[in-house]
Amino acid sequence: MTQLDSRTEATTTRAFDQPRAEAAVRELLLAIGEDPDRGGLRDTPARVARAYREIFAGLYTDPDAVLNTMFDEDHDELVLIKEIPLYSTCEHHLVSFHGVAHVGYIPGRDGRVTGLSKIARLVDLYAKRPQVQERLTSQIADALVKRLGPRGVIVVVEAEHLCMAMRGVRKPGAVTTTSAVRGQFKTDAASRAEALDLILRK
């Protein structure tokens, strides 16, 4: 088991600690010189904690439970879902990044496919964690390989990082593109080119 797999497996056994999160937000407000007891901030620790519980919900969901439905369609060509919206959180600054994911796969020899909504849910699961875009892209691809046994998988993620837009270099509109290719898409240039052409075609 790789280090990445170990981290992914470990997160599925945790539970969100609401009181601890509220206390941490209160301490942060004090650290920046605010009064957490004033009217506008009195309920902020609880609200932020609830928001974090939702934003990081992917830490508490088993990927295998998402890809739990298969259909025997005897399909042996590319299945591609484009422009899946995603919202995630940069683990370096805990600031959002957002964009779209394009996910494609060629079913294995058994021709089994999964529901289209399952692919979107898988993207959400890995996006709703403290992340870096490179790892997010690879995790989606590897989960599909593990669960579907496809002949090939391709994942492309395009996202704008607010840690680059609202602070630091302050370059709003800059888009980062990452890709992960597995199986036939990695070994066969023609298959990869076909998929990328469909992904990039608007």
Curated annotation (Swiss-Prot):
BP GO terms, sorted: one-carbon metabolic process; tetrahydrobiopterin biosynthetic process; tetrahydrofolate biosynthetic process
GO cellular component: cytoplasm
Enzyme kind, highest EC tier: hydrolase
Pathway(s) annotated for this protein in UniProt: Cofactor biosynthesis; 7,8-dihydroneopterin triphosphate biosynthesis; 7,8-dihydroneopterin triphosphate from GTP: step 1/1
Binding site for Zn(2+): 90, 93, 163
Catalytic activity: GTP + H2O = 7,8-dihydroneopterin 3'-triphosphate + formate + H(+)
Keywords assigned by UniProt, alphabetized: GTP-binding, Hydrolase, Metal-binding, Nucleotide-binding, One-carbon metabolism, Zinc
GO MF term (any one): GTP cyclohydrolase I activity
EC number: 3.5.4.16
Pfam families named among the record's database cross-references: GTP_cyclohydroI
Family matches, as SUPFAM superfamilies: Tetrahydrobiopterin biosynthesis enzymes-like
Oligomeric form and interacting partners: Homomer.
Similarity annotation: Belongs to the GTP cyclohydrolase I family.
The protein's name in its UniProt record: GTP cyclohydrolase 1
Species whose genome carries this gene: Mycobacterium marinum (strain ATCC BAA-535 / M)
